Amino acid sequence: MFDVAIIGAGVIGCSIARELSKYNLNVALIEKENDVGNVTTKANSAIIHAGYDAKPGTLKGKLNAKGNLMFDELCRELEVPFKRVGSLVLAFDDDEMKTLGKLYEQGIQNGVPELYILSKEKVLEMDPNISDNIKGALYAKTGGIIGPWEFTIALAENAVENGVNIFLSNEVVDIEKKDFGYRIITNKDTYDTKYVVNCAGLYADKINNMVSNNKMEIIPRRGQYYLLDKTVGNLVKYVIFQCPSKLGKGVLVTPTVHGNLLIGPDAEDLIDKTALNTTSEGLNFIVEVARRSVKTLPLNMAITNFAGLRARTERDDFIIEEAVDAKGFINVAGIESPGLSSAPAISLYVIDILKNIAKKIEKKENFNPYRRAIPKFIELSEDEKNELVKKDKRFGKIICRCESITEGEIVSAIHRNVGARTVDAVKRRVRAGMGRCQGGFCSPRVIEILARELGVEMTEIEKDHEGSYILTGPTKSEVQ
């Protein structure tokens, strides 16, 4: 019997799991995918928003600004890369300058510190590659950039280190109400729990509708992106937005925490919750809009494009509440932007709801907030590199040439407490395959290392999601 079962191991589910691991509770984290953070969390703008865009009084307004200010300490504890580069919202005419004024006032009401409306001259002094056609900008000094999948993996690892039980590749097929709480039935097992926290993202409606007559609908909204090579990662110094619209915060141009340049997204409401394909129309749109923000946009340096889906509801706000007709069942749904930025504050909000329901929740005396990251060989000093290779010679063998990732780093990623089991899971943990050739050189070697370390055949290694097998068998045995 679990005290709390969390359904969904994206950034929200993992953040709540880590927060719950601070208490004397038996916690289950149940995820239908074969890795944490493998849906919405892995494909987004990777921005920690300051909090000026959300309407005051909404959960987004309350939790974004609060969550933003929690990232410095969290990322130090978890050894996750995070940079407060600041953000600029550009205005191109007098009407948009008025919009900046409204955003500024919203930010002040939401408790966002260090907001400034800047002149054109000041903006161009700060970042010369911004378009000369602007009239001014809203500068949010607390805006930041992060690796969302690394953050989520770190949260999961720290949660497991502190006693959380994680069950991957477990898709929930039914939930039954019981006297003790709930029985969660997956495609693999059954889990009894007193309380349920529904963090199922795009499928939070399906999970809610299993137990509640207050039906929910999640609308998938697709956003498409271009990722550019590190050689142009310093094209802009800040996260560059245009004025927001009803469809979202608009197309941005931003450096990434790893030194690339990211542009996007567009916003397209869909029916299909698996439609992660990109379209020529969508990609052309983000390029056209992004070119309005900056003087130059070297699209010839694009190394990949991708799409992500965010979970939208008609409420136009986060849904974080106990279901009216399902006691002890807490929905955390509709967590679209600024969900990543709000994640730490959302976890505290959910804990408060649980405390009101459960009454007695005691804190642990031995909670360990720290998680050691895998050493990044390329970032070490020469002395540190030599010392590491002396301890483990696999750190002296480069597997991914684009990102200078060693065999030692890949092996470490596989044997963590929430370890990599697929090629893309390795990529998300240590960036092997994230570079210019997008895994063209290193993927076969990563497959070989995964198979060796997991004790399976290379044909059993998947690229990412379940069933995405790469190899069918040795070629020599097939040729007659």
From Swiss-Prot:
User: Which InterPro entries does this one have?
Assistant: BFD-like_2Fe2S-bd_dom, BFD-like_2Fe2S-bd_dom_sf, FAD-dep_OxRdtase, FAD/NAD-bd_sf, G3P_Oxidase/Oxidoreductase
Q: List, alphabetically, the Pfam families matched.
A: DAO, Fer2_BFD
Cofactor(s) for this protein?
A: [2Fe-2S] cluster
| Disulfide-bonded cysteines | none
Detail which positions bind [2Fe-2S] cluster. Answer: C400, C402, C437, C442
Entry superkingdom: Bacteria
Name the UniProt record assigns to this protein: Glycerol 3-phosphate dehydrogenase
